[in-house]
């Protein structure tokens, strides 16, 4: 079962005056797509999905970033009363259509423009409910602990489940420091009675839009406005000044260095050959300053580029995985061309092979529970993740010693190995590691 729409970005609904800007914003994540994938509601999206044969089950979170952008574009102004009413209408419609929760991307435009009070107001339809709010927090670098405290405030106020997405502390100065403190905060909040938990991907590198390295205030107005700013000498100088010293945003190049940021999903003839090279390498090859190389690349690509960024510490990943309230995720995006992150193909295999079999940080039963029942229950999917009378017969058969990830950052599109058989709804879709051609996947709605 795949659950999409995380980090505030979902593909539906996608209609209205601001829809073209949202489509452009999603392009580094989804690849470019046409009108045939623009739906007026999540129900319409699900209906189209059900007309398409699916290998796996699919559920969807309602992306609050998509919904806010449909209401107010990428403006940084506080929402008006009327805009909040329209946002609540869209949230309630998506939940009624079967979304298994909502997601936030507080590190991204336009959600980075919320105050804490505005965020709580935006989430009012979730108050006292059972559906979770998943959140890419406002910061994951120097301000990550304060960002977690903000979300604990939200959880206390709304009394709904809150899932901290891909918990980490970005940057060497935060490794081994921020994560232990955050795990203590989560433990204390759970003891207080808050329904808070977290997840983590089993890699030290992440992947998202390349514009995420820029100060958020320059992202107001959407990608067209940002592209224009990247071509303006005054705006470039202001961006550089903020990136050289700023700690009040997720300043990735400052935290980990240009050598640890790798652009992907490049499309122009000028920059496509540099895909897979770090920003430091690209700057050196072009004879440019790293900031100029970054700004020129983004402007040429009209900001529709992605990145792989090496940001986290293995010791922190292991500490999070050991926590009883954590689960592993892929956090994968699925670009239709070019390089992708190896987690697209190998997350579960890497978790089982590296962290369980080789590192021994969890027993196999503990690991399987996290991958199955614990994850399903968090999203209210009561017929998934268990072997029981009345449950769906979705089963994976494997020998632990044979599981392995085959992908690498330079060659990510490699299927993992060791899954002997996979049954979806009781029908074999993989036998002896080979696809059978069956397509028993279904759309899953909250119930």
Q: Which residues are covered by each model-predicted region?
A:
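Acidic, glycine-enriched loop/beta-strand segments at the rims
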Residues: 280, 305-317, 363-368, 376-413
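C-terminal cap of metal-dependent C-N hydrolases
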Residues: 232, 319-325, 330-331, 345, ...
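Hydrophobic residues within beta-strands of alpha/beta enzymes
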Residues: 2-4, 102-103, 133, 162, ...
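Divalent metal-coordination and catalytic microenvironments
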Residues: 58, 98, 136, 199, ...
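Active-site neighborhoods of metal-dependent hydrolases
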Residues: 46-49, 54-81, 85-108, 153-156, ...
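Divalent metal-binding pocket/active-site signature
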Residues: 93-151
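Short acidic, glycine/serine/threonine-rich loops at helix termini
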Residues: 7-19, 69-75, 116, 145-149, ...
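Metal-associated gating/positioning segment near the N- to mid-region
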Residues: 1-36
């Amino acid at each position: 079962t795949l659950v999409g729409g995380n980090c505030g970005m979902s593909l539906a609904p996608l209609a209205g005056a601001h829809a073209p800007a949202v489509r452009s914003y999603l392009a580094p994540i989804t690849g470019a797509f046409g009108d045939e994938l623009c739906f007026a509601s999540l129900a319409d999206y699900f209906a189209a999905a059900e007309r398409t044969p699916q290998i796996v089950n699919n559920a969807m979170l309602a992306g609050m970033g998509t919904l806010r952008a449909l209401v107010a574009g990428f403006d940084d102004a506080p929402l008006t009363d009327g805009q909040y009413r329209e946002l609540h209408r869209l949230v309630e419609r998506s939940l009624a259509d079967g979304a298994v929760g909502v997601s936030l991307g507080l590190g991204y435009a336009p959600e980075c423009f919320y105050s804490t009070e505005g965020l709580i107001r935006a989430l009012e339809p979730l108050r006292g409910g059972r559906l979770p709010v998943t959140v890419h927090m406002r910061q994951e670098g120097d301000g990550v602990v304060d960002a977690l405290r903000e979300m604990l405030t939200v959880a206390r106020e709304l009394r709904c489940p809150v899932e901290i997405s891909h918990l980490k502390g970005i940057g060497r100065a935060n490794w081994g420091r921020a994560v232990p403190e955050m795990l203590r905060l989560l433990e204390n909040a759970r003891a207080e009675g808050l329904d808070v938990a977290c997840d983590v991907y089993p890699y030290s590198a992440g992947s998202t839009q390349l514009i995420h390295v820029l100060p958020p205030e320059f992202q107001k107005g959407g990608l067209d406005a940002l592209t224009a700013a990247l071509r303006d000498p005054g705006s470039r100088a202001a961006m550089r000044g903020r990136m050289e010293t700023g700690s009040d945003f997720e300043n990735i190049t400052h935290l980990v260095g240009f050598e640890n940021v790798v652009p992907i999903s490049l499309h122009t003839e000028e920059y496509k050959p540099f895909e897979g090279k770090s920003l430091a390498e690209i700057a050196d090859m072009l004879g440019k300053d790293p900031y100029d190389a970054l700004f020129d690349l983004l402007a040429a690509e009209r900001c529709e580029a992605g990145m792989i960024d090496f940001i986290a510490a293995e010791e922190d990943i292991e500490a999070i995985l050991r926590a009883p309230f954590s689960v592993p995720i892929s956090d994968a995006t699925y670009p239709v061309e070019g390089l992708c992150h190896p987690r697209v193909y190998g997350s579960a295999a890497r978790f089982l092979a590296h962290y369980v079999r080789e590192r021994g940080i969890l027993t196999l039963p503990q690991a399987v529970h996290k991958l199955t029942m614990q994850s399903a229950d968090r999203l209210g999917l009561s017929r998934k993740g268990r072997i029981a009378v009345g449950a769906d017969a979705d089963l994976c058969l494997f020998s632990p010693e044979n599981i392995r990830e085959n992908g690498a950052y330079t060659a990510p599109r490699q299927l993992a190995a060791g899954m002997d058989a996979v049954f979806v709804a009781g029908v074999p879709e993989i036998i002896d590691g080979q696809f059978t051609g069956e397509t028993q996947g279904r759309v899953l709605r909250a119930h």
